[in-house]
């Protein structure tokens, strides 16, 4: 990612418009924001720039979760997020279906890429949910009770593991889960 990527061409805007949920005008506006936060002007965000960009949009979102988002959307594992990767991220987060959002979140927390959320991975997701719930003014005790019941419902086979299928199927049925996951 070098200086050659620091300008967005008309064909880039058209490509992103066709491959995201954004209009050409929205792509151009997002690009203007992107340039403001691309402090070194190299046409991509490093981790710090990415976090600052998202903090400007989601000030209460925990930084460690923004770092997880960075890892999830760094599709080429270059430790940078170029504009196309950013628009995919924003498209899913902002305009994606509940299923798209749940898939991304599952992938973020399934660190070992096993297709199963193990207890440690579920505990990390629960911590995020508690933070979001508290930031929405809910009591920690009420959130904890809701989350425990929700995860009991999601874990259909009661093996204390949550498969991708269980998470997507039950998660899509729970608007409260989506809210507590910050999506």
UniProtKB/Swiss-Prot annotation:
Gene3D superfamilies on file: EF-hand (1.10.238.10)
Transmembrane segments: none
Binding site for Ca(2+) 2: 110, 112, 114, 121
EF-hand domain span: 25-60, 61-96, 97-132, 142-177
UniProt signal peptide: none
InterPro entries linked: EF-hand-dom_pair (IPR011992), EF_Hand_1_Ca_BS (IPR018247), EF_hand_dom (IPR002048), Recoverin (IPR028846)
Organism domain of life: Eukaryota
Binding-site list for Ca(2+) 3: 155, 157, 159, 166
Lipid linkage positions (N-myristoyl glycine): 2
GO MF: calcium ion binding
Pfam families: EF-hand_5 (PF13202), EF-hand_7 (PF13499)
Statement: the UniProt record of this protein carries the keyword Transport: no
Binding site for Ca(2+) 1: 74, 76, 78, 80, 85
UniProtKB keywords: Calcium, Lipoprotein, Metal-binding, Myristate, Repeat
Gene Ontology terms: biological process: regulation of signal transduction
Coiled coil start-end: none
CC annotations in GO: phagocytic vesicle
Entry's family note: Belongs to the recoverin family.
PANTHER family reported in the protein's UniProt record: CALCIUM BINDING PROTEINS (PTHR23055), NEUROCALCIN HOMOLOG (PTHR23055:SF178)
The protein's name in its UniProt record: Calcium-binding protein M
Native source species: Dictyostelium discoideum (Social amoeba)
Lineage: Eukaryota, Amoebozoa, Evosea, Eumycetozoa, Dictyostelia
